[in-house]
């Protein structure tokens, strides 16, 4: 089902490009700017089974987007400047802002060099447990479990279930099912228990995943001294906030900020909701982020930035630079607002 959805999106992007419809829709739906979502930036990996491919783009694709923005005379700005322009209604020039979620080491090793070429700022949203080396990027651990197994046994809703993982196709099917099940568990402790058991059964060192992929506090301290780099908060544990109590959500927000500020000795005023879609961030989370004192908070709901977003600063949409669609032809489609307009039923604001 997810592969079908991916194919449909790809076909839609190509259709917008080939028909030129994005040129017609740009004046209406491009808005005043775009906040881009990224996770990993690194060279392309080999292997047929890559269920998290959508979370990584190559340095060349990032460079292509930056070239497109510069040639289109679109300003590339920081989250601080996004906030200023929206609140002061300084919107005469279109802008783009680059945000990177989780705090992966490749943001420093690959993305920063590309951003420097264009003197382009970036904001990295850090999950504080990831920087501590105690976090659980469980979707990566799940990929590792399935990659090495010919079958996976798990108890889902009290029913013992055996999933075939002997081929790349069956691995993808199993990953999709287990990913959705794990993300939907009602509390983070349940997810921790289940992914921990899977990793133990299949000899995957879950604790090492975070340390191998994410920047430590010491690395972040050096990274954050780069003039182009901004740091935001991304919760403590990277849990699905919508599944937690008000008290837990507030603690995830404020404690993550406090830890980052203490470790890096700099203020943190921007937040990114873990997962960030409708199933993970809604009106309650938007209100709690505002109450916690964040100037802005970003979702992963697809959308361009319009002047009206100034009234919803803790519910800002983003546009994903998705590893499944690394085709330079679609870059003007992404910045035209045509794709997100169609996705949103031609609504400009989605903050409910």
Feature-to-residue mapping (PLM):
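C-terminal active-site subregion of NodB/CE4 polysaccharide deacetylases
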Residues: 1-99, 106, 137, 141-154, ...
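Extended, charge-rich helix/loop segments that form flexible
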Residues: 26-33, 37, 135-226
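Short, well-structured alpha-helical interface segments that form or flank functional binding sites
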Residues: 64, 106, 110, 215-218
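Append "and occasionally in soluble cytosolic enzymes with long acidic Gly/Pro-rich linkers
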Residues: 75, 219-222, 231-232
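Glycine-rich, histidine-containing beta strand-loop boundary motifs that form or position
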Residues: 80, 124-128
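CE4/NodB-like, metal-dependent polysaccharide N-deacetylase domain
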Residues: 91-92, 104, 109, 113-125, ...
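A short acidic, amphipathic alpha-helical/loop segment
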Residues: 110-114, 219, 284-288
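Short beta-alpha junction loops
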Residues: 128-131, 302-303
């Amino acid at each position: 089902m997810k592969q079908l959805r991916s194919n449909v999106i790809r076909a839609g992007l190509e259709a917008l490009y080939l028909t030129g419809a994005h040129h017609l829709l740009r004046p209406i739906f491009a808005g005043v700017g775009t906040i881009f979502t990224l996770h990993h930036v690194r060279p392309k990996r080999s292997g047929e089974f890559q269920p998290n491919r959508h979370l990584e783009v190559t340095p060349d694709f990032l460079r292509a987007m930056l070239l497109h923005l510069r040639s289109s005379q679109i300003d590339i700005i920081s989250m601080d400047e996004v906030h200023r322009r929206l609140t002061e209604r300084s919107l005469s020039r279109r802008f783009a802002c680059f945000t990177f979620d989780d705090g992966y080491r490749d943001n420093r090793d690959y993305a920063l060099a590309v951003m420097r070429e264009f003197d382009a700022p970036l904001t990295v949203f850090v999950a504080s447990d990831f920087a501590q080396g105690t976090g659980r990027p469980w979707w990566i651990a799940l990929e590792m479990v399935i990659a090495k197994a010919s079958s996976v046994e798990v108890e889902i809703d009290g029913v013992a279930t055996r999933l075939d993982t002997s081929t790349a196709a069956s691995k993808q099917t199993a990953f999709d099912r287990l990913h959705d099940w794990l993300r939907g568990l009602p509390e983070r402790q349940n997810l921790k228990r289940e992914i921990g058991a899977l990793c133990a059964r299949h000899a995957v060192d879950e604790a090492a995943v975070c340390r191998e992929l994410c920047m430590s506090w010491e690395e972040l301290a050096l990274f954050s001294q780069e003039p182009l780099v901004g740091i935001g908060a991304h919760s403590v544990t990277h849990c699905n906030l919508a599944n937690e109590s008000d008290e837990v959500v507030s603690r995830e927000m404020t404690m993550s900020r406090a830890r980052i500020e203490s470790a890096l000795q700099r203020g943190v005023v921007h937040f990114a909701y873990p997962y960030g879609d409708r199933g993970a961030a809604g009106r309650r989370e938007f209100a709690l982020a505002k109450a916690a004192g964040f100037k802005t908070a970003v979702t992963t709901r697809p959308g361009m930035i319009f002047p009206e977003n100034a009234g919803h600063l803790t519910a800002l949409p983003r546009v994903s630079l998705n590893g499944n669609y690394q085709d330079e032809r679609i870059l003007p489609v992404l910045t035209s607002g045509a794709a997100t307009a169609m996705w949103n039923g031609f609504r400009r604001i989605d903050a409910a």
